[in-house]
């Protein structure tokens, strides 16, 4: 079973990640992870925190000589901003009670978390609820992506909407791969420029913008997941992974919500067969998933991100101590983090797919898994 745990606060010493269940023999270096972390920090619209941090993952355990050992992998990402916060965020009793937060921000975990955990200082909630934690998720997803690459499964991501600006044409694989060259990870240059302008306008108004990201995965064989039980359906597992990303409020697979307006004759994908290729679908409205299983086509998933709720012109709130009306507190934040969310979403998809592969084919050593997957792919072509 592939799983990971993360620990760490936004302004703590750093973020820790434990990855368990990765087979032995997978080539893995710091650089494989740091490429993903750098992309997560990129994207037009990020705030001052990204000017401080230079995320670099350090592999502490589970890898020797550039190859995984099959034992748990330990990763650490230092927070450079810790220098400015160590007196406040120290784990010991010497921690100084400063920068106390008592005015919860609408749209954040502040109020609900404070009520659940009986915290008067909402910093004890927001530090962990912060999207800073997604750096650890991306590190785990990057490890999974390395395994997928060794199994000839590739990932791409791009931004399809920021605020009012939308990419209206379908983006092909090559264009999606080039999207990282855009300051907003948009595959359409004209739309990308309009997105930058929209972000700048929101910045000047003290506002924030959300958007929609798309993740593609190709080389995924048919049959991953299962129709047998609700919790084994791969579409459900992918949706849960995407919905768990902070600020994500909706997920689409394939044509998504658009199929609700179509008759069945136009909503589904016909089945075809070609000798040497096997069964395939000439169209891909299903987004590569049918009945809880992959169907052999490219996976297409979208996630909708709400605007960041930390505002320079805060919304009305109530002070937890005085119970009096107040404006919400302000924390350092971004104007738009949609490009970063695209990277986090791709990492989440990579993690779920890697787990599904290991469940399907088993094996504790990479060459064994490669051999089993190759035999299965041959079966799909020759059936």
Curated annotation (Swiss-Prot):
- Cofactor note text: Reduced FMN (FMNH(2)).
Signal peptide positions on this chain: none
Return the Pfam families for the record. Chorismate_synt (PF01264)
Catalysed reaction, written as an equation: 5-O-(1-carboxyvinyl)-3-phosphoshikimate = chorismate + phosphate
Q: Among its keywords, does the record have Ubl conjugation?
A: no
Q: Which cofactor does it need?
A: FMNH2
GO BP annotations listed = amino acid biosynthetic process; aromatic amino acid family biosynthetic process; chorismate biosynthetic process
Membership in a protein family: Belongs to the chorismate synthase family.
PANTHER family recorded:
CHORISMATE SYNTHASE
Query: What is this protein's record name?
Result: Chorismate synthase
What broad taxonomic lineage does this protein's source fall under? Bacteria, Bacillati, Bacillota, Clostridia, Moorellales
């Amino acid at each position: 079973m592939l799983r990971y745990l993360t620990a760490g606060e936004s302004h703590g010493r750093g973020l820790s990640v434990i990855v368990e269940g990765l087979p032995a023999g997978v080539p893995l270096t710091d650089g494989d992870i740091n490429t993903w972390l750098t992309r997560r920090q990129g994207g037009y619209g990020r705030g001052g925190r990204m000017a401080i941090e230079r995320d670099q993952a350090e592999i502490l355990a589970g890898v020797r000589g550039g190859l995984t050992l099959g034992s748990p992998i330990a990763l650490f990402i230092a927070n450079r901003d810790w220098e400015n916060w160590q007196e406040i965020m120290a784990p010991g009793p010497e921690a100084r009670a400063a920068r106390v937060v008592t005015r919860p921000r609408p749209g954040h975990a502040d109020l609900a978390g404070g009520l659940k955990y009986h915290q008067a200082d909402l910093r004890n909630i927001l530090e962990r609820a912060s999207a800073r934690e997604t750096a650890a998720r991306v590190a785990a997803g990057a490890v999974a992506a390395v395994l997928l690459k060794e199994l000839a499964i590739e990932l791409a991501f791009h931004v399809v909407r920021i605020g009012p600006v939308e990419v209206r044409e379908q983006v092909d694989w090559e264009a999606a791969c080039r999207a990282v060259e855009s300051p907003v990870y948009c595959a359409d240059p004209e739309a990308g420029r309009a997105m930058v302008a929209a972000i700048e306008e929101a910045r000047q108004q003290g506002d924030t913008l959300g958007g929609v990201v798309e993740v593609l995965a190709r080389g995924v064989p048919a049959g991953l997941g299962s129709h047998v039980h609700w919790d084994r359906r791969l579409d459900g597992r992918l949706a849960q992974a995407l919905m768990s990303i902070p600020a994500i409020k909706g997920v689409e697979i394939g044509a998504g919500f658009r199929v609700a307006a179509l008759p069945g004759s136009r909503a589904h994908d016909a089945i075809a067969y070609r000798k040497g290729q096997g069964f395939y679908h000439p169209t891909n409205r299903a987004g590569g998933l049918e009945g809880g299983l992959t169907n052999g086509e490219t996976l297409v998933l979208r996630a909708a991100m709400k605007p960041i709720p930390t505002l320079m012109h805060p919304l009305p709130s109530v002070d937890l101590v005085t119970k009096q009306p107040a404006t919400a507190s302000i924390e350092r934040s971004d104007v738009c983090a949609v490009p970063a969310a695209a990277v986090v979403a791709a990492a989440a998809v990579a993690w779920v797919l890697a787990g599904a592969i290991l469940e399907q084919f088993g094996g504790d050593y990479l060459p064994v898994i490669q051999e089993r997957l190759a035999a299965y792919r041959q079966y799909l072509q020759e059936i």
